[in-house]
């Protein structure tokens, strides 16, 4: 049996590195494992919304965010078939802006911070099985590193392996897919914004949208995502959905002089936190493994870092109590639910409306004419406000309802 630890973390993405960073700072002897060598490419939209940038800054990386080759955005534009909304991003302690940074770089930097805090990192090491005591309590895990199996003892394991499906993870439904490619020389109306597109073709497909996020080095991340349920109903595949987005008239114009860099890459997402367990005796899950991707924006980095920070705090508390029971670790899941539950639940409500754009388009049009409502809508996309904050603008719903009734009467 290998060396003993206070905590073993499976997966060195944002959630795992955050857990290892905060746990090490709290004095826990922490081992961080990942199947891959870092840095490594990670398909993603690459956007760091303001709340995510705040979490990154809390890990001591505020100056790194400001490096000149990083993309910055101070506005968000949403285009639907009949409406156009543009708002500045919500201000944070780090400033009224978000960032666009390749995940390859972000993840490597977060891992560097975890190691600088004292965490031990082992790459090319795949966790395979939880170890348990004769009484059934978690006692560590087994891993493969190319040289045969190796065991690591620890009373606590945090699973942060995304959709990897490690045995200790809580199974969650992968309910969305996305695809992105990098292009150099992308046009566009305002490169200080991130751009969200909900085109007529996408509306007919259901809950999906496209995006253009500008990096700071002349490239842009151009992608599209859709719920697996909506995609299945169309009979199309993700590549076709993405290619048709690139052929939209506005996108075709933006890409007219652009050159692709590298292949398009796809990935699966566990969006929305409802229905997933995040703890059991001796185990907590964080980030994508805990289904914490925002149900509207698809952003997961900020929630992963936040959940890692909370999990590390509860790992420290469990060691203080010398109690690693499910009852103790339920404090982590409860705290996460209190902080993000209503936001995710209301986000699901909006996503469930997306396949019925006859209802949603009038709402977007009404929001476009009301500054407060349009800000609330944009902030719901970024995860900086719950969708139900729109209820503070009843006149918008009245206008939208009038529009819907008028459309029905004309039909």
Question: Predicted segment positions?
Answer:
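Beta1/beta-strand and adjacent pyrophosphate-binding region of the FAD-binding site
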Residues: 1-15
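Glycine-rich FAD pyrophosphate-binding loop
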Residues: 8, 24-44
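Conserved Rossmann-like nucleotide-cofactor binding loop
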Residues: 15, 38, 164
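Conserved N-terminal glycine-rich FAD pyrophosphate-binding loop of Rossmann-like flavoproteins
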Residues: 37-57, 61
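A conserved beta-strand/loop capping segment in the N-terminal third of enzymes
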Residues: 53-108
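Predominantly flavin-linked oxidoreductase catalytic cores and closely associated redox partners
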Residues: 113-255
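FAD/FMN-dependent oxidoreductases across multiple families
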Residues: 230-314, 320
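C-terminal helical "tail/cap" subdomain of flavin- and related membrane-associated enzymes
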Residues: 316-411
């Amino acid at each position: 049996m290998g060396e003993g630890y206070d905590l073993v973390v499976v997966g060195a993405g944002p959630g795992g590195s955050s857990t290892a960073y905060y746990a090490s700072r709290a004095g826990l002897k922490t081992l961080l494992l990942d199947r891959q060598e870092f840095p490594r490419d990670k398909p993603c939209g690459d956007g760091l919304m303001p709340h995510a940038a705040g979490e990154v800054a809390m890990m001591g990386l505020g100056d790194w965010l400001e490096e000149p080759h990083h993309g910055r955005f101070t506005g968000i534009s949403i285009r639907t078939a009949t409406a156009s909304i543009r708002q500045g991003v919500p201000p944070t302690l780090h400033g009224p802006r978000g960032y666009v940074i390749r995940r390859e770089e972000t993840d490597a930097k977060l891992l560097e911070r975890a190691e600088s805090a004292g965490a031990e990192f082992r790459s090319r090491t795949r966790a395979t099985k939880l170890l348990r005591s004769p009484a059934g309590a978690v006692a560590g895990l087994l891993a493969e590193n190319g040289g045969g199996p190796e065991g690591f003892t620890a009373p606590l394991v945090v699973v942060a392996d995304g959709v990897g499906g490690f045995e200790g993870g809580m199974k969650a439904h992968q309910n969305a897919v996305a695809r992105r490619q990098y292009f150099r020389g992308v046009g566009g109306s305002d490169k200080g914004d991130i751009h969200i597109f909900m085109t007529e073709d996408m509306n007919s497909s259901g809950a999906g949208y496209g995006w253009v996020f500008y990096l700071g080095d002349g490239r842009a991340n151009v992608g599209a995502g859709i719920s697996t349920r909506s995609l299945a109903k169309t009979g199309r595949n993700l590549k076709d959905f993405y290619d048709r987005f690139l052929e939209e008239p506005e996108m075709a114009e933006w890409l007219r002089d652009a050159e692709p860099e590298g292949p398009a890459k796809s990935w699966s997402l566990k969006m929305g936190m409802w229905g997933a367990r995040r703890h059991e005796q001796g185990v907590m899950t964080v980030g994508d493994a805990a289904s914490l991707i925002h149900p509207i924006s698809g952003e997961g980095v900020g929630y992963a870092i936040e959940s890692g920070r909370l999990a590390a705090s509860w790992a420290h508390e469990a060691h203080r109590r010398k109690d690693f029971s499910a009852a103790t670790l339920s404090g982590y899941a409860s705290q996460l639910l209190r902080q993000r539950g209503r936001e995710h639940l209301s986000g699901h409500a909006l996503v469930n409306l997306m396949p019925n754009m006859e209802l949603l388009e009038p709402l977007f049009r009404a929001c476009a004419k009301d500054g407060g409502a349009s800000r609330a809508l944009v902030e719901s996309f970024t995860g900086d406000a719950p969708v139900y904050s729109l209820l503070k603008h009843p006149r918008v719903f009245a206008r939208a309802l009038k529009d819907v009734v008028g459309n029905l009467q004309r039909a």
